[in-house]
Regions:
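Alpha-helical multipass membrane-protein architecture
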Residues: 2-359
Length: 359
């Protein structure tokens, strides 16, 4: 099915989803999607419905609500045109980029205001319109990606494309201020030394005055070793959840739901859904090949670490020097999904559990 054949109901729902989550904020929207995905996967695992209406899987209005092979509520809502990250989260992030260029969203926020994605943005028509427009854009990008057969996660690819698109649309640098850096783009030590642009008394300015030279995505979690070890732990745990439930998406849903703690101000809680998803897929895709089972968990830990390190590399190159939120976990999932698709094509992984187009 090509993008031009998308049911009008799905397109309208995409606009509504983007508007809704521009009002609530991008990160609250993603945590809500995680809650819905978790509930949907539990229903699937325990024998709940795996159909929506008269359609099989996630097909609604003659179109797959989720390009991923998710079922029931997970696919139709959690990955669909209302709460799917490519719609809701991306719409909320774009709305923050729009509003953050014009005014202060949060006087206590240390970075550029356009990176403030945890706060509700209200109900002003222009803000909702931006969210709705990028929600629609996310539906179209994900659908085109799935139809063309790109061997990556179409939902997260749409999140990444949307992030670059809102930077272009609202006049932000595409990758940030990387030419004037005294050190490598990967170097976060200027943050540790509290180095700033301009005068130090304008931390919430929409310009550069007073801002950190580099702005780590998660100030409590950017050390390579710490991030990698965390990825191993999350990967093993997610692999175990996948093995005992048979669900590719349950661990992803749980870890995405945990973003609610960040929304509530517990900023030391790590972001881990980009570690959980590749680990879960790898665990299920290795089942026919690996014995004993503990080796599967080891492999899941490796994929969790890869997801973690890819996310850290993404934040250092595409977030820390920029003015808006371009989601490091989404970039990570795009990269790890491509790796998984390649390994499936080479016969290293069983392509059956892999929820992406085959190479």
């Amino acid at each position: 099915m090509v993008a031009g054949e998308l049911a009008i109901e799905v397109l309208i729902a995409g606009v509504a989803g983007g508007m809704l989550c521009a009002a609530t904020g991008g990160l609250p929207a993603l945590s809500l999607a995680g809650i819905v995905i978790t509930a949907g996967e539990i229903a699937n695992v325990t024998g709940g419905t795996t159909t929506v209406g008269d359609s099989t899987g996630a097909e609604v209005f003659d179109v797959a609500a989720a390009p991923l092979t998710a079922f029931g509520v997970s696919g139709a809502v959690g990955f669909g045109p209302i709460l799917g990250p490519h719609v809701a989260f991306a719409g909320g992030v774009a709305a923050a980029a729009y509003l953050g260029r014009r005014e202060t969203i949060d006087t206590g926020f240390r970075y550029h205001q356009a990176k403030q994605i945890t706060k509700p943005l209200g109900s002003r028509p222009e803000v909702l319109a931006v969210g709705g427009g990028f929600g629609l854009f996310g539906v179209l990008v994900a659908r085109v990606s799935a139809d063309v057969g790109f061997p990556v996660d179409p939902v997260m690819l749409a999140v990444v494309v949307s992030g670059f698109a809102h930077r272009l649309a609202f006049g932000y640098p595409l990758v940030g201020r990387v030419r004037d850096l005294p050190t490598s783009v990967l170097d976060m030590s200027p943050f540790e030394r509290d180095e700033r642009w301009g005068e130090p008394d304008n931390e919430t300015s929409q310009g550069t005055g007073g801002r950190h030279v580099v702005e780590p995505w998660l100030p409590a979690h950017y050390d390579w070793l710490q991030v990698g070890v965390l990825g191993v732990g999350i990967g093993v745990a997610s692999g175990y959840v996948a093995l005992v439930t048979g669900s590719v998406f349950l661990a992803f849903g749980i870890t995405a739901a945990s973003l609610l703690f960040l929304v509530l101000g517990l900023y030391d809680v790590p972001v881990t859904h980009h570690m959980a998803l590749p680990a879960s897929i790898a665990a299920l895709a290795m089942v026919p090949e690996f014995e004993p089972t503990w080796l599967i968990l080891v492999a899941a830990g490796v994929f969790g670490a890869l997801g973690a390190l890819a996310g850290e590399a993404a934040q250092r190159t595409l977030y820390a020097h920029a003015d808006t939120h371009l989601d490091p976990p989404a970039v990570s999932i795009v990269l790890t999904s491509l790796l998984i698709a390649v390994l499936a094509a080479l016969g290293v992984l069983d392509p059956g559990p892999v929820p992406y187009p085959e190479l």
